[in-house]
């Protein structure tokens, strides 16, 4: 269900409600960090995703597991919000709600999400250079980098910001040269 229109439509009002609560308490960034942690946990554990999505498992069991797993590691307002999602049988949309909340937070803080694919892990200097370049291109105040490694790129990076793709990879350059050579003959 990840990324489906249906889950986005259901997740949006919950994410907006969470954002309203966070703004009223001046904890938007703290809740954002907690949402990132939850997304990391969900991404790492297919078993947890299946557990919270299962209609067979009792709500009290879901609450217990979430409390044990997240405990005091997340803000108590978010923990209460998760319990509400369990009670309303909307916990199945937790991933979509967290993703939507982070999108709202990026909009609020004039932050862009950039997906960067490189052939090797970026050094701190390279990360700074990429962030500076993205800020210059987009006018954003800050940049959230999501990095991925693809050894097939040979060298360079591919940067995706929204629907724009900047291909500065060696593989991309070779492909463009190949296209221009085949088009010239």
UniProtKB/Swiss-Prot annotation:
Role summary: F(1)F(0) ATP synthase produces ATP from ADP in the presence of a proton or sodium gradient. F-type ATPases consist of two structural domains, F(1) containing the extramembraneous catalytic core and F(0) containing the membrane proton channel, linked together by a central stalk and a peripheral stalk. During catalysis, ATP synthesis in the catalytic domain of F(1) is coupled via a rotary mechanism of the central stalk subunits to proton translocation.
Any one of the GO CC terms: plasma membrane-derived thylakoid membrane
Single annotated GO MF: proton-transporting ATP synthase activity, rotational mechanism
Lineage: Bacteria, Bacillati, Cyanobacteriota, Cyanophyceae, Oscillatoriophycideae
Quaternary structure, from the entry: F-type ATPases have 2 components, F(1) - the catalytic core - and F(0) - the membrane proton channel. F(1) has five subunits: alpha(3), beta(3), gamma(1), delta(1), epsilon(1). CF(0) has four main subunits: a(1), b(1), b'(1) and c(10-14). The alpha and beta chains form an alternating ring which encloses part of the gamma chain. F(1) is attached to F(0) by a central stalk formed by the gamma and epsilon chains, while a peripheral stalk is formed by the delta, b and b' chains.
InterPro entries, A to Z: ATP_synth_OSCP/delta_N_sf, ATPase_OSCP/d_CS, ATPase_OSCP/dsu
Family: Belongs to the ATPase delta chain family.
Protein's recorded name: ATP synthase subunit delta
Domain of life, per lineage: Bacteria
Membrane topology: Peripheral membrane protein
Keyword flag Transport: yes
Keywords: ATP synthesis, CF(1), Hydrogen ion transport, Ion transport, Membrane, Thylakoid, Transport
Pfam families for this protein: OSCP
Organism: Crocosphaera subtropica (strain ATCC 51142 / BH68) (Cyanothece sp. (strain ATCC 51142))
Entry's localization field: Cellular thylakoid membrane
Gene3D superfamilies assigned to the protein according to its UniProt record, in alphabetical order: N-terminal domain of the delta subunit of the F1F0-ATP synthase
